[in-house]
């Protein structure tokens, strides 16, 4: 009897392995949902949409963008963490992914344990822009204006804990200005209200604002990266404008639920790598102020872990609190 049970168990295991192998070879056989934890029109959404066509070509299945904004990206990220780990649910997010755990200690997901890295797709600076009515053309003039009117100027970000929020609080910390943070639920609404003059300043990813800078609806003051952006060589960095040790870089990347089959993860990683090498994709990203990243999934994993430690230090030093 035991022999028959053992034989049945072994047969079941072998059949399971064969089925898994066949499933891996068949993957993907239906559309893939790309969960973007921010509303349409923001930088994350823009970069995701640039990648959808080449990803569809590489995978042979449609890529369906599903915008799930709210709570500084935490709503959509939680949805992705709890989605079926079958290779058909992928989170496409930005570097707030490594900021939020240090700002919101009771999140319903764990960014290290609940996700596996697929691709760091693009690197991008935040850009500081102002409404054209603001009488400041550079960082020094903006600092002088803010100091002359303490508490009167406000700055928008895509949400509490976003890279733009971190950049704004660092700006306050390092320059001594008193400006008021106005968090939005995504880049689209934040940009719209800055263009409309409801807020005077905005720290946001370049894809969300750059076309409006070029059209004259917003004025670029500086970028937050260590060096000038290739897409905007005439826009100075905040550091070179006289604010020392000021660097806030952002990334956009894809992650899958942690238990996604290894074969599906590998296929997704290869598809994203192929898409990011596409000359048209690289050109489209550059036009938005972003640069396609050439980073392996293991390097992406290391970046996530390093940033968790970095932002923990910055958040404590700047005394940033949820709003």
Regions found by a protein language model. Give the residues of each.
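Bacterial N-terminal signal peptides
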Residues: 8-18
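N-terminal signal peptide c-region/cleavage motif recognized by signal peptidases
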Residues: 19-23
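An extracytoplasmic/periplasmic, membrane-proximal ligand-sensing/linker region
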Residues: 29-31, 174, 214, 237-240, ...
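Hinge/capping helix and adjacent helix->loop/strand transition within the periplasmic-binding protein
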Residues: 82-88, 102-189, 238, 251-284
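A ligand-binding cleft/hinge motif common to bilobed small-molecule-binding domains
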Residues: 97-106, 170-174, 201-235
